[in-house]
């Protein structure tokens, strides 16, 4: 019994201890565990909701993606159709362009071929015509007949007078031309009784005055000023030149500076002109005018054919003694004393002009002194005496003055004549007519 009571008390103590010290922690642990389980259940429920929402969003995104894909496909299909339509339109346009361009190219090639055929045919025709003409004029009578036909045509021109400018004064204005005529008239008066030697000295003195005007430009400017005080300038010339040149030369210079000139260079030209006249008058006094004219024209033709020689003689920047020495060697014994003096004076007094032009002008001046015009005639062969006479007579009627013929032979002319009088050219050669026909061929 006592054992039972002891055990009961022990059991009660154990129960007390359990209730007092074990049950509260256990209860708290259970409560905490329950809270944890509850929270986990809530979190699980929340997660499940999120998963459900995610599934819904995924499904929605999938639907949207499918819709976008369908839209992209539709847009791509529409763009493809538009691009295909544009490409078809471009292809049609390109085909049309190539077609039109091809037609234009064919037309161009056709026209070009036609032009080439026409040109070739025209060239061949002209070449054949040239051969026929050359064969025809190889006979002297036929070639002479072409000259006669040209003279017949020229004869028809004779009633219409041609205005021929004075070769000497053509480069001047009217005032200077009148002054030059007055100076030449005064020169003729002063040299009426001067002998050949005096004329030679006069030419040298006037050439020296011309060189003085070049080396003393201030003096030349004062003498050439277009003023009314001609007497004052003449007195100045006398003061400067008296005792240094002859009285005749001084009077010529005074007459020159007393005139009114349009330009200062005209006075220089006038003095050089009188220097040439002195030697030409000397040729007249010595009855060698024709010889001098012929020699001048022959030398002029040499310069025309030798451009390098003309260039050397024209180069006034080189020493004049060297150029005159070259001139003397060229002339040798083929020219008279007067011709040599005229050519040397011309070369010495060049002012930038070409030697060939200056010599040609000198030769024409020699002819003009006799009241004639110079006709430079080019022919394929020598003219007969009758043709020369008729040509001179026809030109004399056209220009109102006797004509001096200067004939140049050029076989390439084939036939007919080419005549140059001053600046007027009458071209009646067969070669020029064939050339004209060739230039008129279609391009």
Curated annotation (Swiss-Prot):
Gene Ontology MF terms: proton-transporting ATP synthase activity, rotational mechanism
SUPFAM superfamilies referenced in this protein's UniProt entry, alphabetically: F1F0 ATP synthase subunit B, membrane domain
CDD domains with a match to the protein in the record: ATP-synt_Fo_b
Region (ATP synthase subunit delta): 169-443
Gene Ontology cellular component annotations, sorted alphabetically: plasma membrane; proton-transporting ATP synthase complex
Record localization: Cell membrane
Membrane topology type: Single-pass membrane protein
Region (ATP synthase subunit b): 1-168
Transmembrane regions: 4-24
InterPro entries tied to this protein: ATP_synth_B-like_membr_sf, ATP_synth_b/b'su_bac/chlpt, ATP_synth_F0_bsu_bac, ATPase_OSCP/dsu
The entry's keywords: ATP synthesis, Cell membrane, CF(0), Hydrogen ion transport, Ion transport, Membrane, Multifunctional enzyme, Transmembrane, Transmembrane helix, Transport
Family: In the N-terminal section; belongs to the ATPase B chain family.
Function: F(1)F(0) ATP synthase produces ATP from ADP in the presence of a proton or sodium gradient. F-type ATPases consist of two structural domains, F(1) containing the extramembraneous catalytic core and F(0) containing the membrane proton channel, linked together by a central stalk and a peripheral stalk. During catalysis, ATP synthesis in the catalytic domain of F(1) is coupled via a rotary mechanism of the central stalk subunits to proton translocation.
Quaternary structure annotation from Swiss-Prot or TrEMBL: F-type ATPases have 2 components, F(1) - the catalytic core - and F(0) - the membrane proton channel. F(1) has five subunits: alpha(3), beta(3), gamma(1), delta(1), epsilon(1). F(0) has three main subunits: a(1), b(2) and c(10-14). The alpha and beta chains form an alternating ring which encloses part of the gamma chain. F(1) is attached to F(0) by a central stalk formed by the gamma and epsilon chains, while a peripheral stalk is formed by the delta and b chains.
Name this protein carries in UniProt: ATP synthase subunit b-delta
């Amino acid at each position: 019994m006592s054992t039972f009571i002891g055990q009961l008390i022990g059991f009660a103590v154990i129960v007390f201890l359990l209730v007092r010290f074990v049950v509260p922690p256990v209860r708290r642990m259970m409560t905490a565990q329950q809270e944890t389980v509850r929270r986990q259940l809530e979190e699980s429920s929340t997660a499940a909701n999120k998963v459900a929402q995610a599934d819904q969003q995924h499904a929605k995104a999938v639907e949207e993606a499918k819709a976008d894909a369908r839209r992209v496909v539709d847009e791509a299909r529409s763009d493809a159709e538009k691009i295909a339509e544009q490409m078809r339109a471009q292809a049609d346009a390109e085909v049309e362009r190539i077609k039109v361009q091809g037609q234009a190219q064919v037309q161009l090639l056709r026209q070009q071929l036609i032009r080439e055929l026409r040109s070739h045919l025209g060239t061949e025709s002209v070449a054949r015509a040239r051969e026929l003409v050359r064969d025809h004029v190889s006979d002297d009578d036929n070639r002479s007949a072409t000259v006669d036909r040209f003279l017949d045509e020229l004869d028809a021109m004779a009633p219409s007078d041609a205005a021929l400018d004075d070769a000497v004064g053509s480069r001047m204005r009217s005032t200077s031309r009148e002054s030059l005529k007055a100076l030449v008239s005064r020169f003729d008066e002063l040299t009426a009784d001067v002998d050949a030697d005096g004329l030679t000295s006069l030419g040298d003195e006037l050439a020296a005055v011309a060189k003085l005007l070049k080396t003393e430009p201030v003096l030349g400017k004062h003498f050439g000023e277009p003023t009314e005080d001609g007497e004052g300038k003449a007195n100045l010339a006398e003061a400067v030149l008296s005792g240094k040149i002859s009285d005749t030369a001084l009077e010529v210079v005074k007459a020159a500076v007393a005139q009114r000139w349009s330009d200062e260079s005209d006075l220089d030209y006038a003095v050089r002109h009188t220097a040439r006249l002195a030697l030409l008058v000397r040729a007249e006094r010595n009855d060698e005018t024709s010889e001098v004219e012929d020699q001048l024209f022959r030398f002029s033709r040499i310069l025309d054919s030798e451009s390098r020689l003309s260039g050397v003689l024209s180069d006034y920047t080189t020493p004049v003694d060297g150029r005159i020495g070259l001139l003397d060697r060229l002339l040798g014994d083929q020219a008279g004393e007067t011709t040599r003096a005229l050519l040397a004076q011309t070369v010495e007094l060049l002012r930038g002009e070409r030697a060939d032009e200056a010599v040609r002008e000198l030769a024409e001046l020699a002819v003009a002194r006799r009241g004639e015009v110079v006709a430079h005639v080019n022919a394929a062969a020598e003219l007969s005496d009758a043709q020369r006479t008729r040509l001179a007579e026809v030109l004399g009627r056209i220009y109102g003055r006797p004509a001096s013929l200067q004939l140049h032979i050029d076989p390439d002319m084939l036939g007919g004549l080419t005549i140059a009088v001053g600046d007027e050219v009458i071209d009646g050669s067969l070669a020029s007519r064939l050339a004209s026909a060739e230039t008129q061929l279609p391009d």
